[in-house]
C-alpha cells in the first residue's frame, strides 16, 4: 500500500524525524508510534527505509519512492488480513501522528 501525492520534502521530514537519534532513542520512538498492537519492537533495519520487526513477528517497512511522490508501506504477517490491518494502521499512524510531530 502507499500514500500517493506524498511530496519528497514530507518524506525527508518523516524519515529525519524517525531516525534522528541514537539507536536506543530511535527504537523507543518507533515503538511508541508503531509497536503498541504488536507487543513491542524486536528489531529495526535501516538498509532501505525503515523496516521494523515487531515482537509478534509482524513486519512493517516504510520507504519513500525513488521516482514518485509517494510513501510506500510493506507489511508481512501470519495471513493476508493481518498484513492488511498492520499496513492500514501504520499508514494511519504516519498521517495522523508522525507527520504532525515531524
Region roles according to the model:
Residues 1-66, 70-74, 80-102:
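Phosphate-binding and adjacent anionic-ligand microenvironments
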Amino acid at each position: 500500500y502507499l500514500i500517493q501525492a506524498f511530496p519528497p520534502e514530507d518524506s525527508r521530514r518523516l524519515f529525519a524525524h524517525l531516525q534522528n537519534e541514537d539507536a536506543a532513542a530511535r527504537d523507543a520512538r518507533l515503538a511508541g508510534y508503531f509497536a503498541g498492537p504488536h507487543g513491542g519492537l524486536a528489531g529495526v533495519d535501516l538498509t532501505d527505509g525503515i523496516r521494523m520487526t515487531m515482537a509478534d513477528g509482524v513486519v512493517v517497512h516504510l520507504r519513500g519512492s525513488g521516482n514518485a511522490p509517494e510513501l510506500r508501506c510493506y507489511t508481512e504477517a501470519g495471513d493476508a488480513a493481518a498484513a492488511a490491518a498492520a499496513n492500514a494502521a501504520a499508514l494511519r499512524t504516519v498521517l495522523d501522528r508522525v507527520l504532525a510531530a515531524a
